[in-house]
Amino acid sequence: MTVTWGKKAHDDLDGIAKYLAELSPQAAEKTVTRIQKAVLLLREFPNMGTKVDETGLHRLVVSDTPYVIFYRVFPDHVNIRAIFHTSQRRFLE
C-alpha cells in the first residue's frame, strides 16, 4: 500500500523539525525519524492506529514522542492528514 502526504501533514512535519532543531538538532533528527518510521509502518499495517470516526480517520501515537499522526485509510493508499503534539487541542477539518 502506498502512503501519501497531505499539505497540512507535510507542513506539520516541517514545523516540528524546525522547532526542535532550534532546541536540539539531535532531538529534531530523532523525532522526525521516529515519525517517518511510524508512517512507513502504515504501508504494511494501515489499521494499526485507533479509528477516530466513521469517515475513516485514524490516529497513531508515535512511540517515544509526544506526537500523534492523523490519517485516513483508502482501498489503495493511506493519506497522512496531520501531525499534532499531544498537548495541542486542534481539530481536523
Language-model features, listed with the residues they occupy:
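Enriched for short, Lys/Arg-rich terminal
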Residues: E29, V62, Y67-V68, R72-E93
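Basic, Lys/Arg-enriched alpha-helical interface segments
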Residues: T2-L57
